[in-house]
Amino acid sequence: VAPELYEGLINLQHRGQDSAGIVTFNGRFNVLRGSGFVREAFDETAIKKLSGGIGIAHTRYTTAGSAYGLENVQPFLVNSPYGIALVHNGNLTNYQDLKVELQDNDHFHCNSDSDTEALLGIFASELRKTPPSDHFFNILTTAVTGVFEKVHGAYSVVGVIANKGVFAFRDPHGIHPLVYGVRDKNGKKEY
């Protein structure tokens, strides 16, 4: 899936982009991040080494955090709960408050200046608090509802949960819309 993600990034890039990242999953997360335009950030050899049947990718135009250094480049990952990789587009207006809440309540350290890392921390915290269910979708929607209650601003989110699959959601007001594609491949739907 990495070559398709790479091609998608090339089609999404724009003049203000300063970095890009890709994560795939094959039983473990495989991450590649780089600075500059997509073709500058990655070489095709590195792309081919990203194994896995699912993945997400992101091109970054700096709106929060520094444009320098790879610590602010998405996707961001956490190992617990489940293992989550996440990217987002938008701006969180209460980002600084979220960082304090994560540190004080969850002992979660944000290692970057990116509001995406705080969003991931809140999502992981909400997933961790959600009671078990026979249907993972119920767990996911309960966690996203918790995100809506805490995270203010405009955002669209796409992520991967280890051994569960891809998920997506947007802010409850639809300020940053989200579009996904579906195709039929060998009689199965791919999103």
Predicted stretch roles:
Residues 1-191:
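Conserved short alpha-helical segments that host acidic/polar catalytic motifs at enzyme active sites
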